Each structure stands twice: as C-alpha cells, then as structure tokens.
Amino acid sequence: MFIIPFAVRSTGIRNKKVMTPLSVLAIGSRAVGLWTEKPQAGVVRVIHLDDLDVLEDVTILLYGRLSFMSARAHLTVRYNTVSRACLEPALLELRERLAGAQQAVPGDDNATGLPFKWNRLVRSSLARLHEEAPASFRFASVPPRSRREAPLGHLLLLNPYELVYMRDPPDTEVRHGVDTFIIPRSRLEAVAGHAMDTRIRARGSISLLPMPPLLREAAARWFP
C-alpha cells in the first residue's frame, strides 16, 4: 500500500512522526484500489487487473500523477515524487502481471544519437519493463511554442510486452519530467492514425495520443 499524507507532524519523541493520510493507494495481485479520507472516508474506486487496460505515469519535478484506466473506470492519484522509489517496485510488479506472453519486436534499435535525457529513458525499465529487453522505437522533437521553451520530445517504443509512449510534459515550460502511457500488448486491439493523433484501442479503452508524423508512421507499421 502507498500512503499519501495530507499532513505530517513530529511527535517530539525520538523524531517520530504522525501522518494524517489523505488517501491510500493499494496495488494488489487482483486489483488496484484507492481509499480516501475526504470528503468522507471510504473506498473511492477499485479496478480489477483483468479490466485494467492503460497506465499513465506522469512525473514533473516533485509532482507525480498515476492514472489507471479501464473501459468503465478511471482511477487517478497525485503524490510527491520524493517517495517515487517506494512506489516503483509495486508499479513494475503490476506491469509484470499485466504483460501477458512475450511477443516479437521488429528490431532492437540503437539509442546512439538521442538527446541525453531520452538516451537514458529509452534504456530504462520505465520504457522496456526489463532493461535488457529488445525494443523498437522512434523519437521526434517538436518545435517549442515560444522562445522560452525547449523542443518537445516524443518517444514511441515497442518492447516484447508493451507499447510505451513517452513525451515531455506538454503543459509546462519545464522539461524535467516525462508523461508516459503504457499499454500492454495483450490488451491491444487496434492502432490507427486519427488526424494529428494516434488512436489506440485496448479492449474497451480508447486513447487519443498526440504524436508527430514519424511516430504515427511507426505505429502504423508495427500494427498494420
């Protein structure tokens, strides 16, 4: 379980602290659930793993947001990324449970030439699930909206178990973070271009992800 405190205060005894929880996220072997204390105590939502189709994992400096999506439910929790290391093992274990059987990858692409941030991310377990797993990927940079901003990076990666889409956070000038969508290949039903987006159907869940042309073309080749 992952406790997200509303307040933390010291007891004055041996540096012990008391936490007043705002919410508790539970990631189990059969379901993901969220309990909240406000506006009233009780279970907010439970999504069984058999129904879970898409994960969105956002980190921007100290801000973290996790979304668990199915055709009928959407569960979102916000947290401080100082505690990210405590959460990551449970997230990786959840992805393992959703992964299904290993599937073929068109090729194992080389990360040489990618910007430093993306070179690191493309080799990570966040992108590959297993760091040593083969992966096909495409990377593109989109020009910034203003001179104050850096180019917006987009990465689409196919590993043996998942389709992973990563991008710089689009709603902030800060590029110290990443917005990641993870779709288990066992859930994928259709991938198609839709105007400036890629439309991904994972069983009953439909996601419209804004991708540059190079990434949309790669998705069309991988899932004709």
What is the role of each PLM region?
Residues 1-22, 50, 57-160, 168, ...:
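Intrinsic disorder/low-complexity detector
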Residues 21-25, 37:
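Long, acidic/polar, low-complexity amphipathic helices and coiled-coil-like
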Residues 27-34, 159-164:
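Extracellular/lumenal glycan-associated surfaces
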Residues 34-48:
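DNA polymerase sliding clamps and clamp-related checkpoint/processivity subunits
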